[in-house]
């Protein structure tokens, strides 16, 4: 198996210092509710290519590397305000292949039938775009019932401003929407960090309905097929395989990953294994089968790396 691992920061201790100074809980790699302001220092970031079951690793510095998806010429990688493209050997980097004034704190990215879908998390916004940067579809959480921050403050956004250099703290956001993926029927699934749920969004109307509730600050929604998706119940450390239909969703498999910050999870059906990103302990764990009851491998990394997600090459 050949994996790419993204690290949104390579200065984890600096982040913890920032959270301490702003009276935040540092028991997890991210604060449970987040902070009002982002640190002003350069937080670094990188990609790590993992081969030969972890025995071979290659790194490439890339600031605030986060979401990854297969592109026409390699892999698209999101950063704070742009989408870069790397080849699968990390030999070539094309910076800012796509950038938009509406890109702010980009998180996960996925393919759609028409292009790509990215979570512009800092703006509580989903954007679908093509390779030329044309915006094909957008969904603002603040226009669809999510007007208030966790502190009860109304959020008003200037949709015509250039947000690429503005820092919005997690608690200044109403949802901290951090991942989204398209279902074969055209609806979009999205994970809402603050609300603890996965929702399904109608492309035409923008109307949404809850699909899975009661999660603890979820991440990493991925669609497997017309009937299944996966999501990380982050603080509980649970990787969930979920069956979905028009009426709702039901958890089919629930894997306890032994962490209190599961940053990312994906089920690789071709290899019949889970790939789990433990942000608390800076490790990636492979587990066999849908039930994940057998550990196949564990890769440990520098504690200064704040791991984000993996991409299977």
Locate predicted features:
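Blade-loop segments of beta-propeller domains
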Residues: 55-110
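Conserved beta-strand position repeated once per blade in WD40 beta-propeller domains
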Residues: 66-68, 108, 179, 220, ...
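Residue-level detector of Asp-centered blade-edge/turn motifs that repeat once per structural unit
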Residues: 70-73, 111-114, 182-185, 224-226, ...
